[in-house]
């Protein structure tokens, strides 16, 4: 029986709490054997003959996990009971929270006779607009059942993020085009596209919450280590904010159909293209895990303040107050895009700084 005492391991070296030592045994040929802690076997419900997966991490560590955990699709179910007094958006928030927590089947049932029409409509709207991979499999006045059909491995976090970024950038470009052309219809399409970005954002949060509980799934869904989960969560939020700023500008175009002066629009376009370039640089540094590229993106983003000030100086002469307000609103939102790009690059620095250290 191996010593489980955290004070030492028989060699005069102290162990961290929870650590145990095992002796390597040589069986001849090219095989070595090491025993596994009995409690670990029991906790996971393993038995003789079951397979385990061994994954090498770095130069000196191995990760051992039950092979069944690779492909296990845990069917988690939850039921929400609602009363007639419950605001439909109270139900929606609870539904989203359960989606985030990784539940596969969610049933909404009434405490009284039936769900109100307004409650049912909001639930269906949330499923359609927000909960990616979710379908309504049963629908009646006495209850609605949702099932998350998309599998963890069907769409990796990396792939979901790329698609989310693509939509956000497309919204941003269309916003600029609608400003240049004074195209209210195109601005309206930008506003509608925001739901799609939110869907990807919620999906990414759900996948990260599931994966962080099962370390082996991290690599399966495209992540390298648990600490990257927080980084991805923050990056996804920043991209979501980029889309939000595109929506703010588009709504301004819809509400103020009178075009801005051409010379001002050209200056705004130049600033806008620059902010988009910073966003591209920051996200590329993330995909490539490139510390130096992320650092350059941060430095580049600093120039956006001066571009904004230059535009505001150009319109400082007396002019229509509403026009001045609009220009300030638009340039502020463009500046925020560059700032969120800088935030993304800073997260990449934190995720990749270890790569820059000299190995001793």
Q: Model-flagged regions — what are they?
A:
Residues 9-24, 29, 35-360:
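Cytosolic, long alpha-helical scaffolding segments
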